[in-house]
């Protein structure tokens, strides 16, 4: 018996150990792989956005679809957008700086290029390069001029920059056309001849004038003010009226008055409904009482008619009895009169008798 008990204990311990191992394996398989999920040292699942511990991996989809998680994500996105988008004033300041420094860099680069061109032409320049260079440089200058006008806002400086660029382009084209008689290798692809960012301008394009930019800045400032007023929590200020004014909410007294009026309105509605129900019940009760009274009157009329019928039958029976009694009495009276007259006739004299006969 002792051996059997030990075997059972051993089997239970093995089963428990196997169940725990199975649970661990299932937990390890169900680990959440998400940038918003994180596991601590104890292996508990945490939400990075909400900073909340999730009890189980099965609850992770429900937590992601929850209202609190979505609000936190939206707040983070809004703050990130506000941080990543600099003000237009800073952009214009950088643009003005770049505008002053770019012509100098371009002039230095062009001077260096003209000095190194006699050696480079022997190996790199293909046939027809000068025509393509002139057309591409003219197009690039024509595309760059309006962008500089929009970015800077100073039209006189833009005209000077355009004039310098056109003069530099003409000088470069004339200097390149002189050694055109040198034998050149076969033409190569345009990707080898031009740099990768030749047609791209690193300066951001502005699609509106300065006045429109100022209006956009003012709108953004107003929106941010509204967002800050809405973001303030309830009770941020000690004075409840000031707190309600900043948060653009009704004051506590006004709110209490509104709630009291709503309460009174609801009470009146409930009272009107209850009065209507009571009136309906009273009307139904009155109709029921009238119906009962009518039924009772009908029953009383039936009883009266029945009693009348009984009275008539009794009267008829009484009349018959009286008639029978009167007829009997009359007959008795007639018989008694005959008996009395007979002896008187017998005792009369014969004369009278004969005369009588």
From Swiss-Prot:
Zn finger intervals (C2H2-type): 47-69
Region (Disordered): 98-126, 157-194, 231-255
Bias (Basic and acidic residues): 99-115, 242-255
Listed GO CC annotations: chromosome; nuclear speck; spliceosomal complex
Name of this chain's protein: Zinc finger protein 830
Molecular functions per Gene Ontology: nucleic acid binding; zinc ion binding
Subcellular location: Nucleus; Chromosome; Nucleus speckle
GO biological process annotation, one example: cell division
Organism name: Xenopus tropicalis (Western clawed frog)
Superkingdom, natural source: Eukaryota
A Pfam family that the UniProt record links to this protein: ZNF380_CC
SUPFAM superfamilies: beta-beta-alpha zinc fingers
Taxonomic classification: Eukaryota, Metazoa, Chordata, Craniata, Vertebrata
Role noted for this protein: May act as an important regulator of the cell cycle that participates in the maintenance of genome integrity.
Coiled coil regions in record: 279-325
Chief site of localization: nucleus
InterPro entries, alphabetized: Matrin/U1-like-C_Znf_C2H2, ZNF830-like, Znf_C2H2_jaz, Znf_C2H2_sf
Cell division keyword on record: yes
